[in-house]
Amino acid sequence: MSIFTKSLLTAVCASSLVACVVKQDEAPDDLRRAIPTSDQVRINLPTGTARSLGELAEWYVATRKVTTTFNGGTAWVLVLVHTIVQFPVTSVDGDTYTWGPWSDALDPAEYKLDVRALGDGTYSYQLSGRSKTVAGSSFEVVIDGFADPRPGDLKGNGTFMIDFDAGKRVNPIDSDPDARGQVDVNYDLLARHLDLHIMSTDDAGNPVTADYAYNETATGGGDMVFNIEGDAGGTPLLEQITLRSRWEASGVGRADGRLAGGDLADGATASECWNETFARVYYEDSANFAPTEGNVADCAFATQDLPPL
């Protein structure tokens, strides 16, 4: 958990007029269940810790980095908001429930959470912050979300947006200095589906966009598609890069990749498979980037399957 998250949770407890272990009924009970936990909204990729990085299939490593980035980047949001709504509300104004504003004496920012009951059993929520380091600062929305708990426990759906630029303006001290842009997340717990859209910039200030789509199988496997526009050819021209990874609960999996556009007029595809210990058992590509290895018969998924361009 980040310093930013810890300071917020501490402020919530400190500002409550009652102990944090005390629950009040000012807010609807289903509001507390509306916000999913970080465990409910995550990409579940089997992991192994006993092998060195060099022994692992390269695209398993790439898939793991993508899932780790997503899980880590969104977990603190859900931990924070889900925890706050368990505490007594600070005020109620019609259909809007507010927690805060709160901050410790030495905190560089103060925050509040507003949750609105939309009348049909769904909720919208905003976590806003205001810098204490700049006189006259106004509250800015850092997290903006919508939650629909009506399908039942562990079956809800919703969306949330994280604005990293606003987060840094509100609290430049505790925020991640490398985080920029915004992330939009769409989740459906019943369908075991996640969508993620990122709008950011690279180190040179150039715009970067990326999309993730993830589906979890009933048996614990996964299917993830990652699309990003970036430089793979060494010139200012940008290529479209697609990586689709599929895996079973045991850990065996396959990743298929495609590069198109930019310097790669003819495009290129590649495939890699790994076993239960995440070691490569098969590799091939259409552009002779590297020699073919292994036997496709050892792949858990027999054929290449990429989404259309």
Regions found by a protein language model. Give the residues of each.
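C-terminal motif of bacterial Sec signal peptides marking the signal peptidase cleavage site
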Residues: 16-19
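Generic recognition of long tandem-repeat/solenoid scaffolds
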Residues: 95-101, 125, 160, 194-198, ...
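A generic structural motif
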Residues: 102-104, 128-130, 163, 199-201, ...
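Short helix-loop boundary/capping segments
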Residues: 141-244
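Hydrophilic extracytoplasmic domains
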Residues: 249-309
